[in-house]
């Protein structure tokens, strides 16, 4: 779960970190769901409870490590989309490559995606190099419009871009016996039969990813024997501070 800034938590390990004005979240798995909790299911990061507003879908976005491309990516699931570095991405767009210090906005909530100083595959990390391709995305300018961006009249964008998302509670259909969950927008998720419907990876999937990840680490010269060793090493190199020009609400 996301931790409030200043809560005194000693848990500072993860492959990546989400940092907002008033919360931080350390990724300790290779795939997390951002959205809002409901009576039927929970998500890894409940943005609604963090002040994300009424435009948060129950399953709004997924951040995951793409083992094929060896990078973190964002998959947009919620109909209101996500902003990454001021560009709106909608469901059906290609997955978005995430670089360290990328600014994300979902609903009224702004936060940074941060990686350790050194890549999990070796080599220093730098900020995003912007290359505009032919992807069907909608640009949005002036997302650093002034202090307090993300809420109120001086927020980074108008609420008119959004639809009120009150229909998500019926959005999922259980396909009994198939282990699949389908959303009306065509996306599918998979969960083990009989387990509580939590939008996350199964234990078997996580363990398989752990083994694959450790193999990549050994190939990159990292002397670690278990996944906790990777967490600790990455946490020790974690990006603790954001340059002043990248802080939330900076004019």
From Swiss-Prot:
SMART domains: FHA
GO CC, one annotated term: nucleus
Organs and tissues of expression: Expressed in roots and vascular tissues near the shoot apex in young seedlings.
Annotated Acidic residues bias: 163-174
Domain FHA: 32-89
GO biological process: regulation of ribosomal protein gene transcription by RNA polymerase II
Annotated signal sequence range: none
Function of the molecule: May play a role in the control of plant organ development. Does not show transactivation activity in yeast.
Main location: nucleus
Lineage: Eukaryota, Viridiplantae, Streptophyta, Embryophyta, Tracheophyta
The keyword Transferase is assigned to this record: no
PANTHER family referenced in this protein's UniProt entry, alphabetically: PRE-RRNA-PROCESSING PROTEIN FHL1
Classification via Gene3D superfamilies: 2.60.200.20
Protein name from the UniProt record: FHA domain-containing protein FHA1
Compartments where located: Nucleus
Induction of the gene: By auxin, cytokinin, gibberellin, abscisic acid (ABA), brassinosteroid and hypoxia.
Residue ranges, annotated region (Disordered): 163-209
Ranges of compositional bias, category Basic and acidic residues: 182-206
Superkingdom: Eukaryota
Gene name linked to the record: FHA1
KO phenotype (gene knockout): No visible phenotype under normal growth conditions.
KW rRNA-binding (keyword) present: no
UniProt keyword list: Developmental protein, Nucleus
């Amino acid at each position: 779960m996301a931790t409030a800034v200043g809560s005194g938590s000693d848990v500072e390990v993860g492959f990546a970190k989400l940092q907002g004005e008033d919360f931080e979240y350390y990724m300790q798995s290779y795939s997390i769901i951002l959205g809002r909790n409901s009576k039927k299911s929970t998500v890894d990061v409940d943005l609604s409870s963090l002040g994300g507003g009424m435009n948060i879908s129950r399953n709004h976005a997924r951040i995951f490590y793409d083992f094929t491309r060896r990078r973190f990516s964002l998959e947009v699931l919620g109909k209101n989309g996500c902003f990454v570095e001021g560009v709106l991405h909608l469901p059906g767009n290609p997955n978005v490559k995430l670089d360290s210090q990328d600014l994300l906005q979902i609903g009224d909530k702004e936060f940074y995606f941060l990686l350790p100083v050194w890549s999990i595959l070796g080599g220093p990390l730098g900020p995003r190099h912007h290359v505009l391709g032919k992807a069907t995305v909608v640009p949005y300018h002036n997302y650093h419009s002034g202090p307090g961006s993300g809420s109120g009249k001086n927020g980074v964008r108008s609420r008119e871009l959004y639809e009120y998302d009150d229909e998500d509670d019926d959005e999922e259909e259980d396909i009994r016996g198939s282990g699949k969950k389908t959303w009306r927008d065509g996306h599918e998720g998979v969960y083990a039969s009989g387990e509580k419907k939590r939008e996350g990876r199964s234990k078997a999937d996580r363990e398989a990813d752990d083994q694959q990840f450790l193999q990549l680490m050994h190939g990159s010269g990292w002397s670690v024997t278990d996944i906790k060793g990777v967490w600790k090493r990455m946490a020790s190199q974690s990006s603790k501070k954001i340059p002043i020009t990248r802080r939330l609400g900076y004019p």
